[in-house]
Curated annotation (Swiss-Prot):
PANTHER family: KRAB DOMAIN C2H2 ZINC FINGER (PTHR23232), KRAB DOMAIN-CONTAINING PROTEIN 1 (PTHR23232:SF139)
Span of domain KRAB: 15-86
Organism of origin: Homo sapiens (Human)
One BP term from GO: regulation of DNA-templated transcription
Name the UniProt record assigns to this protein: KRAB domain-containing protein 1
InterPro entries: KRAB (IPR001909), KRAB_dom_sf (IPR036051), Krueppel_C2H2_ZnF (IPR050169)
Top-level lineage group: Eukaryota
Coiled-coil stretches noted in the UniProt entry, renumbered to this chain: none
């Protein structure tokens, strides 16, 4: 059974990739094993795709371009981005992003469900 999804809910503020991006210092990056670096890459690219789905970007962040090219090096936190001491605001932004991603996926599931129901109805008519 499908659950109702409200499409009228709007975010109070736009979510940007920088709101959910994580940056490591050179020292932190140096102690990461390859599997951790690969996980970091995958998570950052997934976060970017989710943000881009909800709020289409005007340009691709340098971190994302770097990761897509397969380069493995640390990035320092850009000026104006949340500091680690302000993790709470970043976490709230991340949760908002996940909420809207969930809503978008729910809408897509509903659309796909209707398509399959209509397809079944069409096939039943053709058989009759």
């Amino acid at each position: 059974m499908m659950t109702a999804v409200s499409l009228t809910t709007r975010p109070q503020e736009s979510v940007a990739f920088e709101d959910v991006a994580v940056y490591f210092t050179t020292k932190e990056w140096a102690i990461m094993v390859p599997a951790e670096r690969a996980l970091y890459r995958d998570v950052m690219l997934e976060n970017y795709e989710a943000v881009a789905f909800v709020v289409p970007p005007t340009s691709k962040p340098a971190l994302v371009s770097h990761l897509e090219q397969g380069k493995e090096s640390c990035f320092t936190q850009p000026q104006g981005v949340l500091s680690r001491n302000d993790w709470r605001a970043g976490w709230i932004g991340y949760l908002e992003l996940r909420r809207y991603t969930y809503l978008a996926k729910a809408v897509l599931r509903r659309i796909v469900s209707k398509i399959f129901r209509n397809r079944q109805c069409w096939e039943d008519r053709r058989k009759a």
